[in-house]
Amino acid sequence: MIDLTINKTGLEHNIQKAKENNIIIPTIAQMQNPDLIPEKIKAKLSHTGLWDVDPVNLFRISWHNEAKEQGGLFQAVPNYVEIPSKLSGVPCRIIAMSGKWFPTGCHKVGASFGCLAPRLVTGQFDATYHHAVWPSTGNYCRGGAFNSKLLACESVAILPQDMSKERFDWLKSIAGQIIATPGCESNVKEIFDKTWELKKDPTMMIFNQFAEMGNPLWHYNVTGYALSELFEAVKKPGQTFAGACFTSGSAGTMSAGDLLKERYPHLKLAVGEALQCSTILDNGFGGHRIEGIGDKHIPWIHNVKNTDMAIAIDDEDSQRLLRLFNTPEGKTYMKDELGMSDEEVEKMAWLGISGIANVLCCIKMAKYYELTENDVVGTVLTDSAVMYQSRIDELNQLHGAYNAHEAAMDHARHMLDLKTDSMLELTYTERKRVHNLKYYTWVEQQGMNVEDLNAQWYDTKNTWDAVHAQAKELDELINEFNEATGLLKAL
């Protein structure tokens, strides 16, 4: 469970800091349902840009933002992309909730909020003393640095040196310090080593997304809730929510699947990873190019026992489709050859690299279970193609100029031709094998307790269920914090 013990001195400092910087903190309930947000805050949002460094943008940590760069408010149905069957090659519906319309263009501001907020409103993190350290393979440290800036905290972003240029360029304007560790997406051990080094400084507080229970708390209560709302809004008579697929970086989004399985007991939940680093599937390891996922370990916060399937995606598939979806030649192919509408084609740019991998997982699941037009599979799009123009440029340099023939080949080879290989429907024993891998990273290397590891497997009620239920207690602390600052009353 999340420690919500109050540190009175730190809390007093944070309240004063919030007063000085006009910071009002949103509740989880408001992130679920923006109708609960005060009208005066909505009035401020109506003339605030989506990426503006303004504390009021904390209230845009929601799947319900209007699809506007400036002055957007909220909408009943979350932003999403439906993948047409003529593109996916499967008859079932695939709906993908979009992270593009969060501040920073990525839903990781939510996970980082879920990690920071409990320590901020309890005073365990003292904004006048501590630096917030965000170890990440890219987007989480962007979200953490952004939230730190909004909350007037100093931040340190840690990410692998081979991540996209766009990530580093943006971080330079937001983070107090950027540390580039050796390697690529899958080199998370090097990130952990750096955090141990930083821990020697008492002013450095680590918010490790792979281990912080605030991450699954947020995704269960906000992402899972929103995906359920989306399905209920778009389903047609006779359709069922058959499956959900999430590639695993920190595995935070997998807890959205925990909520979905409670609401839709027959739903199958799949975790995805890169074929080049298939740790879950076959204890594999290696570098890969699906930025944001697959880090050669099993995250502490992954409820493996509740996971039905593991799916590995070839990183070449996601790279080639990124170019198909985001070049003039690819767009022309989708319009002229597939008959996709202008809106459908333009929305394909809402898929970043890991989002493409998520959709490919959905297709493989659909083929494995032989899903029909009466089935719906859901997923999320962590970020959009905005973060990867440099990768598209690299692909053009590597493979030459794009054309209609290449577009057709990419669609056929990297989407339509997906097979049910490199995937595994997990038995009880296979799930436990994956869960047990946590021991080597978290108990042997990172100082976790073996009793807690066993409790994750044998005591769901007092581990995963208990964390999910802490949203109510956290909201009470947030409300008390806002009341202490007096800023809500002064609106």
What residues fall within each predicted segment?
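PLP-dependent amino-acid enzyme catalytic core
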Residues: 1-491
